[in-house]
């Protein structure tokens, strides 16, 4: 395995872990909690999931050949949810973004890593663009876990090693 292919494998593994962590948190909340906000300026879990999905679809559709900020993306609209989407609608949207990401990752070769891509007109190597996306998504996954844990309170089931537990 080359260092480049090891990197691509690790990127996929890290994104898979982030997706699983967020889904573990989202699965614990009620349908009402999925739409709840802490205050008028905060985002609900559904809004965060919608934004992440929209970001993935924009960044990774035609990744190597078009700017990552697609003209048909309505970023501001990702933060405005009209009505009360169902859990199924939220998760269908969520999954569609991840499918675009993973399909693109599956097509990248070692030689693609030093190619240039653009995000909002800013030049990045593919490595930089992937790292930028991992950072962005880790931030939002942290928000999802924090908000879900807050909403579930005493009913929260940890997604990692519980406190006061010895490691084997």
Pin down the residues of each PLM region:
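Short, charged, low-complexity loops and linkers
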Residues: 1-12, 80-82, 89
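Short, contiguous alpha-helical
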Residues: 8, 12-16, 20-26, 31-78, ...
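Acidic/histidine-rich alpha-helical segments that form the ligand environment
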Residues: 79-117, 127-137
